[in-house]
Amino acid sequence: MTESEARSIITDYYLAESHSADDKFLFVEAQHFLIDAFHDPVDMHNLAWFYAEERNFGLYRKYLEMAAECGFLPAFESLGYFWYYGESGTVDYGKAFYCFGRGAESRDDYLRIGCEYKIADMYRYGYFVEKDEARYKEMIERLHDEISHPENLVTIMSSEFLPDPGLCYRLAEIRADEGRIPEAMKLLRKARTQFAQYLHDNPSWWGNIDEMESVVMMMHDLSLNWDGDIDLYDLFWLSVNKNTMSFRYNGVRFTVECLEEGRNIVIRFNNKWYRDLHSFFEKAKIGGRPITAIYEELTDYEVA
């Protein structure tokens, strides 16, 4: 394999909506070739995130730590999440705080903000540091103000790495607690639109599904008499009452059934079963295309 061939394989992988087992094998081989040949921490970090999407957290950690040893600050942000959420089975808030702190030293504003807003979460919940709700709110207000003026931010990263929707969701919680419901709903609509775009662009990343669920459920909690348009992601709310949703894609009607199985809700769609909604959003496809990638092409929603 040559460098040109390896980079071509990687580019094609990132541009594809879905990946076969062969695609994944070639991607890993290409990344290994580049890492062995050039020792670039960017390639190490990219391979780490491949393993995160595959939920292989042992190899995820291995390549993050390899990149961090090279001083690559984005790897510290990722390690912060690794320890914060205990993706290896062990939560370590001390290591998470250290890693987010290292990432926050970056002169790239997207990376700095991404780390600072997780540090804010740690002050909110008292993880490793003394709980400080006032400091949390001040940090979220400040960071949201920063991202509201993107022309002032210095970055080489793409927009998906700015935690804009996550900050909108947190500020919406603050506004809702203040009784400023219209402002909270406006922030939630923005967060929902952005998470939908993230899931369109990267259907493999399950973390955005978790965030989308929080946004949708809060929107419905704040609007007891829901008068907004229904779309695919309202399944999070509809599934609570075991509703059925249908929609059209290319003129054909499809149905998503939320069915009770013991204490759980399972999903039946297109003659396949999914253990829960998260599995559905991760794996469901129509004609080989991920359901989240064709979200904007779905029309004529009905609920029963």
Feature roles, as predicted:
Residues 19-22, 53-58, 69, 87-91, ...:
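Short coil/turn and helix-start
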Residues 39, 71, 92, 111, ...:
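Structural signature of alpha-solenoid helical repeat junctions
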Residues 12-13, 46-53, 80-85, 116-125, ...:
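Hydrophobic face of amphipathic alpha-helices that form TPR/SEL1-like repeat modules
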Residues 2, 6-9, 44, 76, ...:
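TPR repeat positional signature
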Residues 37-41, 70-73, 85-87, 106-112, ...:
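Short helix-capping/linker turns of helical repeat alpha-solenoids
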Residues 112-125, 152-167, 199-224:
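TPR/TPR-like alpha-solenoid helical repeat scaffolds
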